[in-house]
Curated annotation (Swiss-Prot):
Organism: Epichloe festucae (strain Fl1)
Organism classification: Eukaryota, Fungi, Dikarya, Ascomycota, Pezizomycotina
UniProt name for this protein: Geranylgeranyl pyrophosphate synthase ltmG
Gene name of this polypeptide: ltmG
Needed cofactors: Mg(2+)
Pfam families linked to this entry: polyprenyl_synt (PF00348)
Induction: Expression is down-regulated when the stress-activated mitogen-activated protein kinase (sakA) is deleted.
Length: 334
């Protein structure tokens, strides 16, 4: 979804001067000048201007086929999620020492680390202020719960990387539920809070969040498009314990080659190609594809149970069709 710049109003429209003539106040806050606003939001605006899959916005619209929330409330929720998603990407790129995002230099390589962190933090609070436009009295509590979940998940992923600890599959799936699932869940919980429907779509959204992350892990190591947008096998350079990497390492407990490649944080293409071949040899890409297909089928079953006799599930099914990857036959491993 493309949003206009004024969808994120940082300047105040109604201004009241107090005793200090050089300052302008609005709702207890000192209002920014236009120049100040552009400086503060520059890293965020830079990222938001780049092409994006915008799957969270599309999924919000798809679920709203069931919930029938008024469009003005849907736009508020989309605005909140867009701000949080892009702010989290700014921070992720710093924490992961990334070089590319969506095919261009990461924001902190343009604006610096300090200014990028400040812009991301500001976005969290601008998003929080948008909650005032919703009617659900629990909106603020839901917002806090899911942002705490997101940071807990991110913290565990950082811990595994920095301590070179390979998590179990179950540990990784729990982390996904918190980190990746957080914004998916926040959007739908806020949407449900504005709806007259009593149906609960959180379980379906949890499945979709897990599906999205595992598919992203797979594509990072297998997709030419991902290589162009983020760099070749960037997850290996970051030292990330992604889903196929975890399966590969744990399928051969005595083989330390892959975990040592992660330790090096190598940018050498040949080293990363060797790692990809190793992951392939353990059947981990096939395992990942089969997991993706299993999650797609699980989501379709959950959708059918929610749909009953209505035909509201078409947009969600379209999203699932796009996320599906044809399973591979089991290959012979070394």
């Amino acid at each position: 979804m493309t949003m206009a710049a004024n969808d994120f109003p940082f300047q105040c429209q109604e201004k009241k001067s107090y005793s200090q003539p050089s300052l302008v106040y609005c709702n207890g806050n000192i209002a920014e000048t236009y120049l100040e606003e552009k400086v503060l939001t520059a890293p965020l605006d830079y990222l938001r201007a780049l092409p994006s899959k915008d799957i969270r916005s599309g999924l919000t619209d798809a679920i709203n086929e069931f919930l029938r929330v008024p469009e003005e409330k849907v736009l508020v929720i989309k605005r909140i999620i867009d701000l949080l998603h892009n702010a989290s990407l700014l921070i992720d790129d710093i924490q992961d020492s990334s070089k590319l995002r969506r095919g261009v230099p990461v924001a902190h390589h343009i604006f610096g680390i300090a200014q990028t962190i400040n812009s991301a933090n500001l976005a969290y609070f601008i998003a929080q202020r948008e909650l005032e436009k919703l009617t659900n009295p629990r909106a603020f509590a839901i917002y806090n719960e899911e942002l705490i979940n997101l940071h807990r998940g991110q913290g565990m992923e950082l811990h595994w990387r920095e301590s070179l600890h390979c998590p179990t599959e179950d540990e990784y799936l729990r982390m996904i539920q918190k980190k990746t699932g957080g914004l998916f869940r926040l959007a739908i919980r806020l949407l449900q809070g504005e709806s007259a429907s009593d149906d609960d779509y959180v379980s379906l959204i949890d499945t979709l969040g897990t599906l999205f992350q595992i598919r992203d892990d797979y594509q990072n190591l297998q997709s030419d498009i991902y290589s162009k947008n983020k760099g070749y096998c960037e997850d290996l350079t970051e030292g990330k314990f992604s889903y196929p990497v975890i399966h590969s390492i744990r399928s051969r407990p005595g083989d330390v080659r892959l975990i040592n490649i992660l330790k090096q944080r190598s940018e050498d293409v040949m080293v990363k190609q060797y790692a990809v071949q190793h992951i392939e040899s353990t059947g981990s890409f096939a395992f990942c594809q089969n997991k993706i297909q299993s999650l797609v089928e699980q989501a379709r079953e959950q959708l059918a149970a929610l749909e009953n006799s209505s035909s509201c599930g078409g947009p969600v099914r379209d999203i699932l069709d796009k996320l599906a990857i044809k399973p591979r036959a089991n290959i012979e491993v070394e």
